[in-house]
Amino acid sequence: MNRLLICGFGPFPEALDNPAAPAVERLKLDHWATSGATVEYAVLPTVWDEAPKTALEALKAFSAHAVLLVGVSVHAELFRVETRARNRVSQIHADAQGRFWPSPLIDDNGPAERFVIAPAQAMTAAIQARGLTATLSSDAGDYLCNFTLYRLLAEVPMTAFLHVPTLSPRIDLDSIVTAVRAAAQAFAADLI
């Protein structure tokens, strides 16, 4: 059976109440199942180098075939399934430890973009089928979400990323858990 790792990012300066990690932790407690894959979970520190390192260590420990990254976009009003990562990083946003990435590039020798081959369209449709607003996105930003997606795509081709909105009267934690579960189920179905 295939193994899917779901990783949620922890808090960072612009999102001290980042709902990504709590949503992933809730899924773990729910003991839900998906056909086609065994699921494991991890919380990633929102720290340069540590986020991809933690994800890769969890992938290895679990012998996972694929990973679904979940992060918050403080600017998003809907769920966004990312389709690519760019070799760029913000020079004005510090990580959770107050550090800045030392270069405008993630990898000085890497390609300008890395594309997601995971079933982004099916994941988007699955979220929409649950009555939530979701779209495909070709811009994962220039912070740790994009950074980690770019790094992981180099090591684990079956990496997907779901950006979730911040908590609001319109989007509560239950909605975010529903979206992550739907995306994970669609992703796992593609692994069969």
Where are these regions (language model features)?
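N-terminal catalytic or cofactor-binding beta/alpha core of small enzyme domains
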Residues: 1-140, 153-157, 174-192
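Short active-site-adjacent structural elements
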Residues: 14, 145, 168-172
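Hydrophobic, aromatic-enriched interface-forming segments
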Residues: 144-151
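An accessory alpha-helical subdomain
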Residues: 159, 163-168
